[in-house]
């Protein structure tokens, strides 16, 4: 069925929720001609801040990478003292750049807590 092959679709962008490796594998098996991109962007940002092009090899683990930062954004994993952790270390992801919101509109209390 030509409609099931999605002949006009060149890319599928997954964003908003984590894309599971299993779902990515199913997509790549069914639509190998359509590129698959895993995007990441927290609510505090105006849009996605990183992209990862998913291939069959990357779907073998328990999660998919979020990829590299988009232009004008920067990603770092920091510890409780806001210092960078070594590769593979445990910390929290910090996003900086032009896409990060400056606070909560007309709500200085929530902005201070953020």
Where is each model-derived feature located?
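AMP-dependent adenylate-forming
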Residues: 21, 29, 35-38, 52-114
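Non-catalytic, surface-exposed connector residues within folded enzymatic/regulatory domains
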Residues: 3-6, 48, 105
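SF2 helicase/translocase ATPase core recognition
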Residues: 40-47
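Short gly/Ser/Thr-rich phosphate-binding loop of adenylate-forming enzymes
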Residues: 1-5, 11-34, 43, 61, ...
């Amino acid at each position: 069925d030509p409609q099931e092959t999605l002949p006009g679709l060149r890319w599928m962008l997954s964003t908003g929720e984590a894309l599971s490796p299993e779902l990515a594998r199913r997509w790549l098996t069914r639509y190998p001609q359509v590129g698959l991109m895993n995007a990441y962007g927290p609510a505090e940002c105006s849009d996605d801040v990183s992209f990862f092009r998913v291939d069959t090899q990357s779907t073998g683990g328990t999660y998919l990478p979020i990829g590299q930062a988009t232009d004008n954004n920067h990603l770092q994993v920091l510890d409780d003292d806001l210092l960078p952790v070594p590769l593979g270390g445990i910390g929290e992801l910090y996003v900086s750049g032009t896409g990060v919101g400056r606070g909560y509109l007309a709500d200085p209390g929530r902005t201070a807590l953020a």
